[in-house]
UniProtKB/Swiss-Prot annotation:
This is Surface presentation of antigens protein SpaO. Belongs to the FliN/MopA/SpaO family. GO terms for biological process: bacterial-type flagellum-dependent swarming motility; positive chemotaxis; protein secretion by the type III secretion system. It comes from Salmonella dublin. Coiled coil: none annotated. The lineage of its organism: Bacteria, Pseudomonadati, Pseudomonadota, Gammaproteobacteria, Enterobacterales. Involved in a secretory pathway responsible for the surface presentation of determinants needed for the entry of Salmonella species into mammalian cells. InterPro entries: FliN-like_C, SpoA-like_sf, T3SS_OMP_SpaO, T3SS_SpaO/YscQ/SpaO.
Amino acid sequence: MSLRVRQIDRREWLLAQTATECQRHGQEATLEYPTRQGMWVRLSDAEKRWSAWIQPGDWLEHVSPALAGAAVSAGAEHLVVPWLAATERPFELPVPHLSCRRLCVENPVPGSALPEGKLLHIMSDRGGLWFEYLPELPAVGGGRPKMLRWPLRFVIGSSDTQRSLLGRIGIGDVLLIRTSRAEVYCYAKKLGHFNRVEGGIIVETLDIQHIEEENNTTETAETLPGLNQLPVKLEFVLYRKNVTLAELEAMGQQQLLSLPTNAELNVEIMANGVLLGNGELVQMNDTLGVEIHEWLSESGNGE
């Protein structure tokens, strides 16, 4: 069964967005079909960011009611065009974010030449404007969503190994951390580094503007002889925490972040991004490692 997807015309959608904004400020703004009677003149800014249509007779009636009758005489619309072009501000645009400098005025055309579809009708101080195209509304900051959080993980190191090793790992084994590092990640992005101190950790560097993509690939210089030699990247996660943007910014100011009690007893062991087990952070001779307490291997060795 095919999906019934509602089609949205971007031009009309932008007009509708502006209409809603104008109505919020007490202006009359409606999307409607203009009459195709009489003559029309299209206006736009020099950058062609917006365009609108006016009826010369309507414009004259608001500028000079005494001259409005001239609009019905043959060729009177063509006299309005140079007048509009020569006037610095022929009207006040009812849409605040639009520019009216260097107005482009086209020659009059009959109503039959108007574009298909609805136009946005807004009254200005010089009569009605029928907008055909409008740019996007300026972005308005709605504040930070307070409920939005980002998952951080504090990684103490990693080791590169092969798939065949995973089948031989069991509870009580110690996985050595070959590459010691103290890095903060949000998803696959490295945010910075941290130091372990008494009572918690302190984030030393945190650069949200220039975050790095984590490299999860293990390079090999030769063709793999079999599936058991597929590369596996083990990652050891000391702690995870979901934070708000305000909390994330505070971390960059070297604020002490308290660790949960016995965090060193619950280090997560990730393999290619998948949780396989957890254990205790230990030091074997001069090398950090994790002694496995729980192991979720598919081999059946361990739990």
